[in-house]
Amino acid sequence: MERTKIDILISGGGIAGLTAAAAFGTAGFSVICVDPTAPVTERNTDGSDLRSTALLQPARDFLETAGIWAKLNPHASPLQTMRIVDAGGEVAEPRLTRDFDASDISDRPFGWNLPNWLLRREMLARLDELPNGTFRPGVGTKTLLTRRSEALVSLSDDTQVSARLVIGADGRNSPVRRAHGIGARTTRYGQKALAFAVNHPIPHEGVSTEVHRTGGPFTLVPLPDYNGMPSSAVVWMERGARAKELYELPEDAFNDAMSERSCHLYGPLTLATRR
């Protein structure tokens, strides 16, 4: 069996795994990152991750050190204001609103929002620039044997890696965690989240808005304009059964439902991606 000797093996090619790979590679370590599923790096491709990630100031500085931020900056939406809206009651309407402005504590925004599919695309581009960094899509972790000075990892392509450090960045059902016998406890809250992007006629002006009602928050996070209109990423938390009902609605009915749930703060919302 072919064996490769490296400093670090990372199992998982999501945002956490690719960030670690780029950071360690930039620091001079030899790195291999594997993932059984190739990341989807286009917005409208089936399987793309339509969630977004808000990178706060320390994360932005870390990504700059890892050589990634210069690639992300042109696509990032600054988060200047955090707005909390209490819309409880029979009718979805704002009853209490509180704004928190980043200028009260810093000369920079709270953070910057980016779509997850785009984060993966730019992180892969950074990893591709590094002579000591390798990404291997379609390859997963099979077995893990730890010794005093190294870990021997067998991969799904029948190769083996000897690494000084193994990082499990492979999700809640982590093969690395299970291979090493590390247990986990699962707590279920009876909620599910719908994630998608929307267009709206009223600009968000860098405001991230959480609208709170029974069932969970409805959060709009700024994105760059899309198709000439203001755009936001949405995470809509609801009880499981209600989330399923919403997911199965025809698009026009879904647009109406989410516009009402948002209290029409940005005008009528229309889907800009699948949900």
Per-region residue spans from a language model:
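Conserved N-terminal helical subregion
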Residues: 2-4, 75-179, 187-192
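N-terminal FAD cofactor-binding segment of flavoenzymes
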Residues: 47-89
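Conserved FAD/dinucleotide-binding core of flavoprotein oxidoreductases
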Residues: 105, 214-275
